[in-house]
Amino acid sequence: ITEDIVRSRYQASIQPGAQEAFSAMFPAPRQRWVHALASPEEAIRALPHETLVIHGREDRVIPLSNSLRLCALIPRAQLHVYGHCGHWTQIEHAGRFARLVRDFLTE
């Protein structure tokens, strides 16, 4: 993660109302909302579409094992793992990420 990304995220977090907005999206207890957003395995297995799963190998927010599990469940999934990348593949590898998504959507 670059200093620019750190600075950008910090600046966003100290904007007036930022903390309140986050808390409103995920009120305590936060894990309850994570579970509420989860889909049952049967629904995931039933996905009929080509599915692109993208993950940063060094992601400390969501373990890579989650994406590996998704790909095991989704019949038509493909996984792309970016090395030297944390949670924000779309920022940390913006150009490569955009090309990958564009190519996936235009196939």
Annotate each language-model stretch with its function.
Residues 44-48, 73-74:
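Short, conserved loop/helix-junction motifs that constitute active-site signature segments
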Residues 50-52, 75-78:
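Structural signature of beta-strand start/N-cap positions in the alpha/beta core
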Residues 32-34, 58-62:
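Acidic catalytic loop of the alpha/beta-hydrolase fold
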Residues 56, 63-66, 92-93:
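Active-site helix-initiating loop/hinge in glycosyltransferases
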Residues 1-45:
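Conserved alpha/beta-hydrolase catalytic His-Asp/Glu region
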Residues 40, 63-72:
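Short alpha-helix in the alpha/beta-hydrolase fold that links the catalytic acid
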Residues 76-107:
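Catalytic active-site module of serine/aspartate enzymes centered on a nucleophile-bearing elbow/loop
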